């Protein structure tokens, strides 16, 4: 009798190229693959890996968060903030410090504000010429768990110490907010 081999763990599941058929993205992948091969810098490896990622793993980041992270790192205005994703505007911030940003996408309002305050916006092919090894740059990304879908992940809703949101149709007092959630309806957890 032969032994049945379990092939469950044989395949390594990770992206080696982007799912998207966007030719410009594919060109960037080609460029950063070349850069990593020639420089062996971790910076290029990280950018290459993030270019493969799905849109949900390329979360947007606001201008205020970019400014905050730059300030935390104590970086001057010559440093380039690198985001493999979208940079969005933040209307709550009246003042936008001068900063240089490199991103896959920059929203119209964010672009307007960066340029208005004397900053620069780089594309990734321009960044490859300016900083091929990632010198004088700061890599940053948005919060991946900020999506609404993440509020439903975790311990089952209704279990003690769970803050997970249930998937509900009705949000009234008599439904998921009733038994176990208020002392007037059986008990309160």
Curated annotation (Swiss-Prot):
Coiled coil: none
Protein name: Large ribosomal subunit protein eL18
Recorded family membership: Belongs to the eukaryotic ribosomal protein eL18 family.
RNA-binding as UniProt keyword: no
Species annotation: Aedes aegypti (Yellowfever mosquito)
Cited InterPro entries: Ribosomal_eL18, Ribosomal_uL15/eL18, Ribosomal_uL15/eL18_sf
Record keywords: Cytoplasm, Ribonucleoprotein, Ribosomal protein
Principal place of residence: cytoplasm
Key word Ribonucleoprotein present: yes
Subcellular location: Cytoplasm
Domain of life, source organism: Eukaryota
Biological process according to GO: translation
Listed SUPFAM superfamilies: Ribosomal proteins L15p and L18e
MF term (GO), any: structural constituent of ribosome
GO cellular component: a single term: cytosolic large ribosomal subunit
């Amino acid at each position: 009798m032969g032994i049945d081999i379990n092939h469950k763990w044989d395949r390594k599941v990770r992206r080696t190229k982007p799912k998207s058929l966007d030719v410009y993205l594919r060109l960037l992948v080609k460029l950063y693959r070349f850069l990593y091969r020639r420089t062996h810098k971790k910076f290029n490896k990280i950018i290459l890996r993030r270019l493969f990622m799905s849109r949900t793993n390329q979360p947007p980041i606001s201008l205020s968060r970019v400014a905050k992270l730059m300030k935390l790192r104590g970086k001057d205005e010559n440093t380039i903030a690198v985001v493999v994703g979208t940079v969005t505007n933040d209307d709550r911030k009246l003042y936008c410090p001068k900063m240089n940003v490199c991103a896959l996408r920059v929203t119209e309002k964010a672009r307007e504000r960066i340029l208005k305050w004397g900053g620069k916006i780089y594309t990734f092919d321009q960044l490859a010429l300016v900083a091929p090894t990632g010198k004088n740059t700061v890599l940053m990304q948005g919060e991946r768990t900020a999506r609404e879908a993440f509020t439903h992940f975790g311990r089952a809703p209704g279990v003690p110490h769970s803050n997970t949101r249930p998937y509900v149709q009705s949000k009234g007092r008599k439904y998921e907010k009733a038994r176990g959630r208020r002392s007037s309806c059986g008990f309160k957890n």
